[in-house]
Swiss-Prot record:
Pfam families: Ribosomal_L4
Molecular function per GO: rRNA binding; structural constituent of ribosome
Protein name stated in the entry: Large ribosomal subunit protein uL4
Region entry Disordered, spans: 48-87
Keyword flag Coiled coil: no
Keywords attached to this entry: Ribonucleoprotein, Ribosomal protein, RNA-binding, rRNA-binding
Assembly: Part of the 50S ribosomal subunit.
Function as written in the Swiss-Prot or TrEMBL entry: One of the primary rRNA binding proteins, this protein initially binds near the 5'-end of the 23S rRNA. It is important during the early stages of 50S assembly. It makes multiple contacts with different domains of the 23S rRNA in the assembled 50S subunit and ribosome. Forms part of the polypeptide exit tunnel.
Family: Belongs to the universal ribosomal protein uL4 family.
Lineage: superkingdom: Bacteria
One of the GO biological process terms: translation
KW Membrane (keyword) present: no
């Protein structure tokens, strides 16, 4: 099993912790990660774009001129697509961009991304993040103690409310619970800081 250093809040090492190879020892699959990111980004699209076709544009109910005898091309409505102010042909309509991937493929993508973080030494496990009260400065000090200055995904349990409140105002930190870990926020952040209890929950879900 892969092992990584276990740290305290003050940055000192507190032994090591074993990582489940079924989650953190997977050979990274870039194609699966790419597909999973595309799927999640597609699901974030609003899809509310719309234009008016010739049936939705106001006016145009009267034939602009008679069918024959004017020398001009025959027309049935001034809201036909060829007219200024006419309806749009084949324009976008409201739709959902969501599509599905098999559950095992989605899990493999997250496992691949997490395994890559471990290989890059960008996976930091903390014994606990205990705060008496929500203090952004105190959490920033903890990040400094851990030598983490990059854009970071902080994973804490539901019980670590003060830690979550302390970190949420930091520009370079994104705070989630184990249930909120997804392929997009794992890949989008350079480092992951996770508590030991949150690590157990992540392994329980993905293993």
């Amino acid at each position: 099993m892969t092992s990584v250093n276990l740290y305290k809040q003050d940055g000192s090492q507190n032994g090591t912790v074993e990582l489940n190879d079924a989650v953190f020892g997977v050979e990274p699959n870039e194609n699966v990660v790419f597909d999973a990111i595309l799927r999640q980004r597609a699901s974030l699209r609003q899809g509310t774009h719309a234009v008016k076709n010739r049936s939705a544009v106001s006016g145009g109910g009267k034939k602009p001129w008679r069918q024959k005898g004017t020398g001009r091309a025959r027309q049935g409505s001034i809201r036909s697509p060829q007219f200024r102010g006419g309806g749009i042909v084949f324009g976008p309509t409201p739709r959902s961009y969501k599509y599905s991937l098999p559950r095992k493929v989605r899990q493999l993508a997250i496992k691949s991304a997490l395994s890559q973080k471990v290989l890059d030494n960008s996976f930091v496990v903390v014994d606990a993040l205990n705060f008496d009260a929500p203090k952004t400065k105190e959490f920033a000090d903890v990040m400094g103690n851990l030598n983490v200055a990059e854009k970071t995904l902080v994973v804490v349990t539901d019980d670590d409310k003060n830690a979550a409140l302390s970190a949420r105002n930091l520009a370079n930190a994104t705070v989630v619970t184990p249930a909120g870990v997804n392929i997009l926020n794992v890949v989008d952040n350079q480092k992951i800081v996770i508590t030991k209890s949150a690590l157990s929950q992540v392994e329980e879900v993905l293993a």
